[in-house]
Amino acid sequence: EISERFFQLGHEHEIEDEIFNMELTPNRGDCLSLHGLVRDLAPFYEIDLTSDIYEKELKELELGFVNHAPEACSHISFLKIEIEGEIAAYRGKLKEYFKDLSINKNNFFTDISNYISYEMGQPTHCYDAKKISNLFSLEIIEEDKKFHTLLEKEVVIKGRNLVFLEDGNVINLAGVMGGKSTSCSTNTKSVIIECAHFN
């Protein structure tokens, strides 16, 4: 039945076991997540997607962040999360999910960030709060800069790029790749989560 609804909506797809492989057209980027597809199906099944799933009373985060490139990033926000005690076993619940999507398992915060990206269609990036200062910025740079990536590689960024800088050093190639210096690990208990819309 769901397959028929997808065809009615113009979504070409194939079914393998219980997995829908979607063939989305370039103009339907809003459907590049589970939430986006459910939103398309909602009228057929009278599903209400308007309920809030977040805590409205959030304490303001004191962060000395400056956006020097509003033309390249129109909206950006940060949320700090601290976990007390041990992180419960969670990978069993995400094991098949990650396997089906060919996602590598890393650490708790990175795994949850990847999960949210596929579920909600909103990429996020996690910084280990103990490895980043309160003073960093988003800037467009044009000079060559060295960058130590999450993949343990040191590269030279050339040309015009949108980057997050801390003390003049690149800590994140915006929307592309995070840096090793502020990355999360299995020992991370406090993170700053970046959620941005890059134009």
PLM features per residue range, with description:
Residues E1-N199:
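RNA/tRNA-interacting regions in translation and RNA-turnover enzymes
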